[in-house]
Design a protein with these regions (language model features):
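N-terminal capping/small domains of soluble enzymes
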Residues: 1-75, 81-84, 89, 276, ...
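Active-site-proximal beta-alpha core segment in soluble small-molecule metabolic enzymes
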Residues: 34-206, 228-231
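Glycine-rich beta-strand-to-loop/alpha-helix junction loops that act as flexible
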Residues: 39, 177-178, 207-216, 244-246
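Short acidic, glycine/serine/threonine-rich loops at helix termini
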Residues: 92, 113-114, 134-140, 185, ...
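Feature marks short, surface-exposed loop/turn motifs that line or immediately flank catalytic pockets
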Residues: 132-134, 179, 215, 248, ...
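Charged helix-capping and loop-helix junction motifs
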Residues: 187-192, 221-227, 257, 323
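Charged (often Lys/Glu-rich) extended helix/loop segments that serve as interaction or gating elements
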Residues: 228, 239-383
Length: 383
């Protein structure tokens, strides 16, 4: 089956591009000795976990459910971080995770006994806040913004040490401060980490540099990244971890959709699609951003310009304005690009919108549907 034969709406995972990304990441691992983990919050299509596991060291989770998924479907290194863990969650996490990272000293102290009494050795980390913002235009995703709840500042850590925290029981530090950024932002962040926490790094076993590294983007400076990794590895004798999410499946997915109707208002021709920004690609409204669309241009660039929208009742459920060389008609199919990341993991059934099917496309461009969602999937989430 080819992509234009799939029922719409449908997410399509491009296994050829996914493999290209994994080869790039695996190359960084081989050259630097770093361990790279899939951040499941961006991409949790576990059908592909056997493929991903052939190239990466494992996964990182944002809570119990993701950690369970990784344990069941990949079975490699299993890391977890959450701003706060429930006591009953920790009972299971100590059985299935290798690394557990805490957001605060109080969380570590609350769960310390369960970790130390676990049947296996759990590597314990603390998330630090280097108080170094490098983002522009993504404030909602900036963990170093003033008043952030994420990570421990040096001031807070010093206070905890003064009050009796035994750092010798902590194996590593974790920071996650980037979002879709190049390695120059990592270099800047590492300078802040060394300035604020460098004296404490010598006593640790590992440093996790988090995610937000757009390593597989065409213009990403991999050489600088590798220098950063080796600098921290060699200076402090640390094992280095990276946990990208987007970089694993960047440009490795599509969202195939059909034009249901065309309406006009104030001279604007509006395409009503069987997909939705609010339901199927929430980051379009949350960031916001205009997703790439195959065979299209900027508004006015090509002969025919349309506004792309949805069949939900939300007035603001608008994807963006695009232009085309040809006139679009009801029944035509359109294809959004870069739809593997932060799509399937964030979609919802607001307004009773059906969830898109999920398909995989092999290197011969042949597609196979691996999941279909029907009415019962909508109903089972309600009561």
């Amino acid at each position: 089956m080819k992509i234009n034969e799939l029922r719409t709406p449908c997410y399509v995972i491009d296994e050829g591009k996914l493999t290209e990304n994994l080869l790039i990441l695996n190359g960084v691992m081989r050259r630097t000795g770093a361990r790279i983990l899939l951040a499941q919050k961006a991409f949790s299509a576990f059908y592909e976990y056997p493929l991903i596991g052939r190239y990466l060291s494992g996964t990182t989770a944002s809570g119990l459910f993701e950690a369970r998924l990784a344990h069941e479907e990949m079975g490699k290194e299993n890391h977890v971080f959450c701003p706060a863990f429930l006591p009953q969650e920790m009972d299971e996490l100590v059985e299935i995770c290798d690394h557990i990272v805490f957001n605060s000293v109080s969380q570590y102290l609350l769960h310390r006994d369960k970790i130390e009494k676990a049947d296996k050795k759990i590597s314990v980390g603390l998330r630090i806040n280097p108080e170094c913002s490098t983002q522009e235009g993504h404030e909602i995703y900036d963990p170093c913004a003033p008043g952030s709840r994420l990570g421990i500042t040096r001031e807070a850590l010093d206070k905890a040490i003064k009050n009796g925290l035994d750092l010798s029981r902590i194996d590593g530090f974790h920071f996650h401060t980037l979002c879709e950024q190049d390695s120059d932002a990592l270099e800047t962040t590492l300078a802040a980490v060394e300035e604020k926490f460098g004296d404490l790094l010598y006593g640790l076993k590992w440093l996790n540099m988090g995610g937000g590294h757009h390593i597989t983007r065409a213009d990403y400076d991999i050489e600088r990244l590798e220098k950063c990794i080796m600098h921290m590895r060699d200076k402090y004798d640390l094992e280095i971890y990276l946990e990208p999410g987007e970089a694993v499946a960047l440009d490795a997915g599509y969202l195939e959709t059909t034009v249901l109707d065309i309406v006009e208002n104030n001279g604007i021709k509006i395409l009503i699609l069987d997909t939705s920004a609010a339901c199927h690609m929430p980051d379009v409204l949350e960031m916001p951003y205009r997703p790439p669309l195959m065979d299209s241009g900027e508004p006015g660039e090509k002969k025919y310009t349309y506004r792309l929208s949805s069949c939900t009742c939300l007035a603001g459920d608008v994807i963006g304005d695009y232009s085309f060389d040809r006139e679009i008609k009801t029944g035509d199919r359109l294809c959004f690009c870069d739809m593997a990341i932060y799509s399937m993991v964030k979609n919802n059934t607001f307004n009773g919108m059906p969830l898109p099917d999920i398909a995989v496309m092999d290197e011969n461009k042949d597609c196979k549907v691996i999941r279909r969602f029907e009415y019962e999937d909508f109903k089972c989430r309600l009561s």
